[in-house]
Amino acid sequence: MSNYQLEWVSPKQLRPHEDVILSIVNENIEILRKDNSMAPIIVDKNSMVILDGHHRYYASLSLGLPKIPAIMIDYNSEQVEVREWNRIIAPDSSIRDFLRVFRSSVDGKYCVSYKSDVVFCDDNIYSLYWKEEAIEQLLSRMGYNVVKTADQEATISIPPVPKNVVIDFSYKGLRFPPKSTRHIYHFYIPKQRIILQWD
């Protein structure tokens, strides 16, 4: 028995949980127009929350596509995991002193760490992720290169967003920063592009 089902769904039925980068949405719009095809997005069949494919989703909304291909899975399955994207920051030499400026309460359920040092914590993981995003944006403007990675040896580590929080915040209409969740599927997910239906 398959762990997923491929369906055509209206983008208006779907619930995003992550924000997007406008330039990537625009790139996706151009690709959809040029190729007339897209890789399916991945959606929880029970809640209609988008798990992967937010930029393609927003591109399809912009183009007014009536239906898009979606791989429908059971998010509650133990075969679906949510992991974190850690960060590598370069150059690394002065980053510890810079992060001390942001050091606040180290009390809280969720914490961001620089190597093994806790930088800040919060009881609300949504607030924690947006604080981290603001710091990353500031670092980028200052000339640092911030790369999100699966590497466990990365410079900055952040806890994964629990599945129930992904669903709850999506239903509240709130979005985590781009590339907050890293979903791992312990079963085959097809990635072939599918010809779009425009009517």
Curated annotation (Swiss-Prot):
Disruption phenotype: Cells grow a little slower and form smaller colonies than wild-type, reduced survival after UV treatment. Cells undergo almost no recombination in mating reactions. Keywords: ATP-binding, DNA damage, Kinase, Nucleotide-binding, Transferase. CDD domains: ParB_Srx_like_nuclease (cd16400). It holds the Pfam family ParBc. InterPro entries: ParB/Sulfiredoxin_dom, ParB/Sulfiredoxin_sf, SerK/SbnI_C. One of its GO terms (molecular function) is ATP binding. Gene3D superfamilies: Conserved hypothetical protein from pyrococcus furiosus pfu- 392566-001, domain 2, Conserved hypothetical protein from pyrococcus furiosus pfu- 392566-001, ParB domain. SMART domains: ParB. It comes from the Archaea. Belongs to the ParB family. Probably part of a 4-gene DNA damage response locus in which the upstream ups system, in combination with this downstream locus, functions in homologous recombination to rescue Sulfolobales from DNA-damaging threats. This protein might function in the DNA transfer machinery. This is ParB-like protein Saci_1498. It comes from Sulfolobus acidocaldarius (strain ATCC 33909 / DSM 639 / JCM 8929 / NBRC 15157 / NCIMB 11770).
